Amino acid sequence: LSIRRQRQMCIRDRTMEQMNGLVAVNSLMAMVGGTLAAFLAGKNDPGYVHNGPLAGLVAVCAGSNVMHPLGALITGVVAGFIFVKAFALTQNKWKIDDVLGVWPLHGLCGVWGGLAAGIFGLKALGGMGGVSFMSQLIGTGLGVAIALTGGFLIYCLLYTSDAADE
């Protein structure tokens, strides 16, 4: 009982000023998870190993103030694997020219992070609470819809202006 209370005091009973430590620890845990996953899944490829920590950081941003550090580590691990697999798929199978891996790194890992905040932010999993998976799912879906709409409109604008120039 006392260990459980200590853990609750460490995480749940914090003021906003005290949250900075939790955010810093969660950021580091996600970086470690992303690095390890990219190292394992990317077979020690330097490009993957360098982007693994970024994948973890991008993913944990949505929930760094509500997750337990173990949840942040898991979020980073999953993001590292997502980045390696999606980057390889984009480059090798789909032949899409995304040399820096912006779409898998920021797009897919960001979507995972939005959903992970709704999972690992729950009090039942050691998080701070105040979030729900459904709210995160809806918010992430709306963010993706807005990004796709904006990207499509800009593509159409550039495509028609290129046709007029030729």
Predicted feature residues:
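Single conserved hydrophobic/aromatic residue that forms the stacking wall/gate
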Residues: 1-7, 11, 159-166
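Helix-coil boundary and interhelical linker segments in multi-pass alpha-helical membrane proteins
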Residues: 12-18, 62-70
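The feature identifies polytopic integral membrane transport proteins across all domains of life
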Residues: 19-24, 49, 96-104
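Structural signature of hydrophobic alpha-helical transmembrane segments
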Residues: 19-30, 71-77
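Transmembrane alpha-helical segments of multi-pass membrane transport proteins and ion-pumping complexes
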Residues: 30-39, 43, 56-60, 64, ...
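Cytoplasmic-side transmembrane-helix entry/capping segments in multi-pass membrane proteins
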Residues: 47-54
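A cytosolic-side transmembrane-helix exit/cap motif
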Residues: 69-74, 90-100
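Structural signal for the N-terminal portions of transmembrane helices
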Residues: 127-145
